Amino acid sequence: MFRTVLALAAGLLVALPSGAALAQADGFGVAPQPRPGNLASFTLRGGVQVRPEFPGSDEYEVGPDLGFRFGGLEIGRFGIGDPDPELVQTGLGLRGSFRYVGERDSSEFEDLRGLDDVDDALELGVGLAYRQDAYQVFGDLRYGVTGHEALVGEIGADVFVRPTNRLTLSAGPRVFFAEDSYAQEYFGVSPAEALRSGSLEPFEAEGGALSAGIEIGAQYRLNDSWGIEGAVTYDRLLGDAGDSPITEAGSDDQYGVRVGLTRRITFGF
């Protein structure tokens, strides 16, 4: 059922006009008056984050945080978004979506002894968002091109407050969905694994809404090229993700913190 819903959502995205389909992360609308020449702009983020060691864990690790956000693209008379870093692009548009999920080496955790290891995963996909000056709503759809090879999705919303023209504060809810194979990969326990473990019961995890939470973020623009960005997240594991023996040995409350520098790059070609 979940795969069918995601497939329909993907079909709707594909059916959008081809101009909109070229939009990437945070690229909204089509620029009505493109500048002469070819231009492209995007923002890279690099920093550190604190996150659970694996989904359902009550232990945390510090690791790198990377991000990408699309700004604008102009080719001849055709344009999407805008290279202007001060412009708040509004309306309905597509955006890119990606997420990295680290590996799980079960031998490193006493509670997971006997379970199969889980490879790290890179999820790539697209999202549809509607944005205004004071808020946005969005839905993202991704596929694990490495690792779990499952469809996952996220829906959410944000409200924006801008105390100054350089500082943007945001806050909003998030709900994460995944299909059965993802849920089984991270939260399931096969009979063979349960036998090897000696402490965990067999558990067949099903997909659906696996977590719900909130993200509170801040962006500060140092100048036209550089900025500082951070966020605090909280997610509560739901459904079989929350009922899993793996989670019961850890925690269904999942926290995260990230902070990093952003660099906006604009170039002609």
Describe the predicted segments one by one.
Residues L22-G76, F269:
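Short glycine/proline- and aromatic-enriched beta-strand/turn motifs that initiate or cap beta-hairpins
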Residues R51-F54, E110-G114, D140-G144, S199-E204, ...:
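Extracellular loop and loop/strand-boundary signature of outer-membrane beta-barrel proteins
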Residues Q24, E86, A150-E154, D158-D252, ...:
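Outer-membrane beta-barrel transmembrane domain signature
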Residues P36-L44, Y60-P64, G76, V88-L94, ...:
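Outer-envelope beta-barrel architecture signal
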Residues G46-V50, L66-G72, D82-L87, V126-Y130, ...:
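Residues on the lipid-exposed face of transmembrane beta-strands in outer-membrane beta-barrel proteins
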Residues A7-P17:
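Bacterial N-terminal signal peptides
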Residues E53-Y60, V118-D120, R142-V152, G208:
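Solvent-exposed loop/turn segments connecting transmembrane beta-strands
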Residues V48-F54, G72-E74, F98-R104, Q132-A134, ...:
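Transmembrane beta-strands of outer-membrane beta-barrel pores
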